[in-house]
Amino acid sequence: MPEYRPPHIRTATPADEEQLARLDRDTWSTLHAVTPRPQPPYPAFFDERHLPEDYLVAELDRRLVGYIRLAFPTPLASNAHVRQIQGLAVSDRARGLGVGRALIRAAVAEARRRGARRLTLRVLGHNTPARRLYESEGFVVEGVLPGEFCLDGVYVDDVAMGRAL
């Protein structure tokens, strides 16, 4: 059995854009995406709403294998104590190696470092692996929007989860 090595987690840089865009396209699935599959020409991964500093990336053997996006859920000052996970992706080759868990733990630590008191996320109801992972890291279901999305002709719940920091 190979020795476990935790991924190296760091803040994204503009130089990561191409790899992140490819990872995002390669991991697209109706298990977690509510937008259509990306088609060329592909939009920029980073833009005025999606800045490199919003992303933590995971590397194994110096290869980018995952990311998590940590952002404000709203622009309201009254909500500034909350951060939200707004994207998590792990390459197929790195699944089952603890990359997703390491990214979630790094996001929790980073949200705390930035002064957040709560961390929230939304996950599709049929994404059982992600829901189990989030629950194992202390997230609880805080609300469900039944049948919020229609994906491939099937109505899917939108599940709000959160945890105190």
Language-model features: where?
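Conserved beta-strand-loop-alpha-helix junction that forms the acyl-donor binding cleft
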Residues: 121-131, 147-154
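Glycine-rich phosphate-binding loop
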Residues: 94, 98
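Acetyl-CoA-dependent GNAT
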Residues: 2-7, 11-17, 22-93, 104-106, ...
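Conserved active-site alpha-helix within GNAT-family acetyltransferase domains
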Residues: 101, 126-143
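Conserved GNAT acetyl-CoA-binding A-motif
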Residues: 111-122
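Short hydrophobic/aromatic beta-strand or adjacent loop that forms the aromatic wall/cage
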Residues: 53, 156-160
